[in-house]
């Protein structure tokens, strides 16, 4: 790919973010509806956990292949292919039942998201100037899709039925083809020989722990926790709580990106990880204290800090691995986050019925805090 100007990088990043914003709702709404209505899809709760983890787990082996496809075929082709797979998968949720049929759709979406995610990270960091600002604005655009999708999906499911939600979301994904077509067509080179999963550095350890705790335990437990405390109108309450997570990303991600540009993305990532771990600890403490105020304080703290963290990994990776090493480093970081986020739902399904929530969320808090502190001692190359 020819070197982009700052304006071209801004425009390409914006289009890639719009593509992902239109495609994400079909996936995110599953995290709301599958745990609450497994019987509609002929599923058991363990099968729900498997399906919610499958799209992450397939990227463990698929991310490096998708990164090579992106590097050789370019953002436009990769994202057009991914949008097509997304549309098929989302419409499939309208028609199909049974764990094996749905598993195929989840694997298809997992690889599609890999391409969309690499495009967003790579284009945001394609020009060294203003990477944090560009990534923050992109995260804000991306988060708007799931925010509106969760709110609309909860209302549709309540009054029109669960299956109708995915028919609408499949239609919503179709305009993403237009924005994908406007992405740069030229491919970008990639450093050869990088293994799909190598020995993790400090950034990869942090990515794993963030995926395991914030994307796994916290997100999967969010709908269940809110529904347990709000039995009346559970789907609307859970949908609103999950939408708040993405709504705050719309507001806070651009602010976080600009803040990271001024103060240093690595420093802000460490500080935000520590405060997010405090929020997880509060969620666990609410189980002991019995106070709803403690629960909501923990949920809000974790949601806010997760939004702050979202745009920060890409500029930290770009700082640590400059030049052509950036793409494989981004793929490795995303792979380790997916490993954590894939194992998180599986662990949650086993831990919550057997172990007190205070212990589960306390362990999550310790993992995230430790991974954040480990970044203090690591240095850019």
Predicted regions: what they are:
Residues 62-74, 251-264, 352:
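Helix-to-loop junctions at the C-terminal end of transmembrane segments
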Residues 107-142:
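Cytoplasmic helix-loop-helix junction between adjacent transmembrane helices
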Residues 53-67, 240-255:
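Central cavity-lining transmembrane alpha-helices of secondary-active solute carriers
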Residues 32-46, 220-237:
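Short amphipathic helix-loop junctions that connect adjacent transmembrane helices
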Residues 115-128, 308-322:
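Intracellular juxtamembrane helix-capping segments at the cytosolic ends
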Residues 43-54, 133-137, 230-247, 294:
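Loop-to-transmembrane helix entry
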Residues 77-91, 170, 267-282:
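Structural signature of the two symmetry-related core transmembrane helices
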Residues 266-313:
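C-terminal transmembrane helical hairpin of 12-TM major facilitator-type secondary transporters
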